[in-house]
């Protein structure tokens, strides 16, 4: 077996590397070239919104394409640029805006992986006769430990927990996992940068890309209001107890769990508890009203060894991660008449619809990724949940 788990020599193995123009994917290309693989680099032109083309830390725009080209020249490998701007807008940017005006907190990086990188780009790699598509994600994959799943691969958290990107890859299907390779899974970020320096790559000291590449300066409201002008319609700011505390200029300016910049002063610390998109109300309350014990999932991608219905029916003990910055915490996947849900043993504050809930076998670097889903709705502690439901059923002021 070669280093990518193929039963042939590296020179007889063609690999397409998804090159963003950053240090991680550049090092992947360099490592594979060094090992003797037949390497092709592909960069996707995903968007162009003026200043971001040359903004430090942007991704998949003009400067990044040029950086990827220069890296490929240094390594002596072919480089191709594919224009996926229309596809990216259709499957990532527009749904992002729709999700925001629906009161959700979307994760466009997951959608990009699902619909562009691991779908369209993967198909292109196959058309080019590649045996695998390699990326610079910090995650690991290896052959499945179960004999009956021979030929399949499983996902695991990486060695560098601080760079763990498994949360954004929970939706990767089994077919995609079997074709993908992640050469950085056993490396730390400092080791990756050291390799880039050693290889003489121009991107060795380049800043890391931001999570949401198409949002200038991180202002979600700017792009949402541009795509959906009605999203800026105002409404009420309402306390969980029913008091109208003030008004706002659009729910797109708020997120669940937000405390600063709410726009009302009552002498008590208040947090955004819920965004009522239908009535354009921002519902606020005390911190304890954010505590969530149960989340219902949609679009579940299950990577476990048994059927999901069987696992959920009996209760599947696991660890769940509802934020990219959190460590996996004890949980149990179950189901009822309303669908698949996850019980968070220790609870979690500020869980919002649209976020991902990734599932794991544990918390360490050997933890297997069981997949996960998008949070459809969450349930709070009984008192807060009852107050919220009563408020949602009451008509908003005209």
UniProtKB/Swiss-Prot annotation:
The gene is mnmA. Its EC number is 2.8.1.13. The active site is at residues 112, 213. GO terms for cellular component: cytoplasm. Signal peptide: none annotated. Catalyzes the 2-thiolation of uridine at the wobble position (U34) of tRNA, leading to the formation of s(2)U34. This is tRNA-specific 2-thiouridylase MnmA. GO terms for biological process: tRNA wobble position uridine thiolation. It comes from Sinorhizobium fredii (strain NBRC 101917 / NGR234). GO terms for molecular function: ATP binding; tRNA binding; tRNA-uridine 2-sulfurtransferase activity. The keyword NAD does not apply.
């Amino acid at each position: 077996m070669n280093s990518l788990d193929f039963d042939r020599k590296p020179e007889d193995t063609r690999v397409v590397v998804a090159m963003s123009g950053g240090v991680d994917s550049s090092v992947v290309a360099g490592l594979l070239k060094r090992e003797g693989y037949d390497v092709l680099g592909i960069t996707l032109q995903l968007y162009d919104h003026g200043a971001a083309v040359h903004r430090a830390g942007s991704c998949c725009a003009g400067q990044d394409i040029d950086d990827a080209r220069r890296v490929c020249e240094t390594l002596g490998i072919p480089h191709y640029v594919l224009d996926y701007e229309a596809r990216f807008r259709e499957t990532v940017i527009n749904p992002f805006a729709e999700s925001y005006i629906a009161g959700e907190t979307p994760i466009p990086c997951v959608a990009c992986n699902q619909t562009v990188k691991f779908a369209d780009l993967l198909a292109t790699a196959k058309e080019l006769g590649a045996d695998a598509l390699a990326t610079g994600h910090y995650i690991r994959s290896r052959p499945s430990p179960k004999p009956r799943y021979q030929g399949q691969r499983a996902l695991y958290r990486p060695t560098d927990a601080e760079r763990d990107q498994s949360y954004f890859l929970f939706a990767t299907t089994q077919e995609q996992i079997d074709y993908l390779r992640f050469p950085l899974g056993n490396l730390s970020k400092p080791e990756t940068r050291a390799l880039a320096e050693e290889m003489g790559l121009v991107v060795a000291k380049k800043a890391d890309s931001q999570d949401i590449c198409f949002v200038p300066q991180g202002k979600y409201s700017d792009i949402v209001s541009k795509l959906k002008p009605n999203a800026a319609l105002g409404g009420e700011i309402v306390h969980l107890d029913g008091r109208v505390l003030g008004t706002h200029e659009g729910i797109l300016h708020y997120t669940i769990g937000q405390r600063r910049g709410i726009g009302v002063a009552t002498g008590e610390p208040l947090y955004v508890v819920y965004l009522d998109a239908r009535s354009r109300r921002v519902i606020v309350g005390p911190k304890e009203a954010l505590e969530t014990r149960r989340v219902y999932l949609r679009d579940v991608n299950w990577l476990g060894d048994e059927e999901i219905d069987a696992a959920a029916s009996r209760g599947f003990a696991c660890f769940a991660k509802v934020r990219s910055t959190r460590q996996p915490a004890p949980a149990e996947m179950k189901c009822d008449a309303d669908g698949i849900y996850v019980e968070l043993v220790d609870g979690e504050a500020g869980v919002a619809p649209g976020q991902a809930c990734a599932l794991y076998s544990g918390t360490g670097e050997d933890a297997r990724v069981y997949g996960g889903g998008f949070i459809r709705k969450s349930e709070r502690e009984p008192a807060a949940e009852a107050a919220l439901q009563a408020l949602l059923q009451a008509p908003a002021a005209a």
